[in-house]
């Protein structure tokens, strides 16, 4: 699985399992407590996860996590994790290797940038710490693994760089991408539509086009909406 595919799949997973109540946590090692090798880091994470699962069970919930290691060229080590909500004080008591940074995840439900960071950290560690390889990220087994529906359009002139956004959805403009597929050799055009949680009446659908010269997304049909 290449980087682009890994980011796309991880984005689907994060979007399907986390929301504004979830947390993005970085567990950092103090300099004198850094792991000597990948096996030691994994052992530390396994101990941490046992504590998290026990704490979540006691609170009446089930831990849902995704984590990746980050090891710098000079040995600085961190563990990055997405986790459903857990009490901050409880979490602090589970990590005795240094300090933790906790950031609430936003309520957008769209975590492509976070997925890209996770894959970047993972690839960085594969280069700086011998022994890390294989998986781009690690996760609990209870996560929802979405499988998006795919439709192949074979009609003539169907591929015209036009995106019609149906009522109740909006276009994630940063997701629009056109490139040559590294395996098939065919050109592909991809984008993400996000379900809009805001209730509003729409008379017309938004239509967007990709400007091939500038690479920018242009609105070709203005949306007409009535606010409640």
Give a label for each model feature.
Residues 79-83:
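Cys/His-coordinated zinc-finger cores
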Residues 1-75, 86-228:
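Right-hand nucleic-acid polymerase module
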